[in-house]
């Protein structure tokens, strides 16, 4: 988790936000989002959770300006979500990576860089770093149509970051990725948050959400059922857990007896375990310690340098030009 940036104005502000889909005759058909309210602050990783059909994707699309709210208030960077200046500060990874299948990974990133009017030199530097970060440098000249789902997902993640956005919206970012890729995405999210970036994460993998999110909102049937800090929602204040080096059997029994006298209950004793993700990454790391000639993904474990630089004090104008080469 990261320290949240104190800001007088939230990056996203929603109040009584409602979206009603209508039929051909303009009659109300589905109330997908029903009068929800939430704020997302700068430097925060905010999780938007809920089962299928709960209204998560509709909410994300309204934030991105792809859908117009039926009623209520929604502001992104203090402006309408449809404002072009706001959109230029957003990076978006949709649930399904819709990429041009006949373009290579490099060509796709170059295309998106041109859309953001990035200068050629800056654009190529960002592309090189993103390809290395996502482990696709060895496959950068292959058509994306030949990629596996996981490799295509990495290209989608790279395009979402090409403009060094201030707000990153990630819809199921780890879908199709192997455990190493999932760990890299989580580390990347934490790095972006430390830079003061704001991240909205929607995922059904709750372990990932728990690991990286500062706050979450859980939706159901178009409303927010609960929202708050992850730690506050999950903490069990009536229980306590102790971790200490293994003791000799007689010393351990003495400690347990003291706990039984104090609490009147039988304490549970076990040994700490690593997560399966940690064990998997350690095992794969040993296999990959020997040199090979990768043909697909070759993860570096690093983060693109331009994403690790100091937070921007001004807009990206110095990296852009009206004449795109």
Residue spans of the language-model regions?
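A general boundary/transition motif marking the beginning of the first structured unit of a protein
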Residues: 4-9, 100, 118, 182, ...
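Arg/Gly-rich low-complexity intrinsically disordered repeat tracts
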Residues: 316-325
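ABC-family P-loop ATPase nucleotide-binding domain
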Residues: 1-29, 289-316
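Exposed, low-complexity/repetitive linear segments and helix-based recognition motifs
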Residues: 3, 41, 92, 205, ...
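ABC transporter nucleotide-binding domains
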Residues: 9-201, 206-220, 225-226
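Short, surface-exposed, charge-dense and proline/glycine-enriched linear segments
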Residues: 138, 152-161, 172-176, 232-235, ...
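Generic secondary-structure transition motif, activating predominantly at the C-termini of alpha-helices
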Residues: 107, 131, 135, 238, ...
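Short, charged/small-residue-rich alpha-helical element at the C-terminal edge
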Residues: 230-297
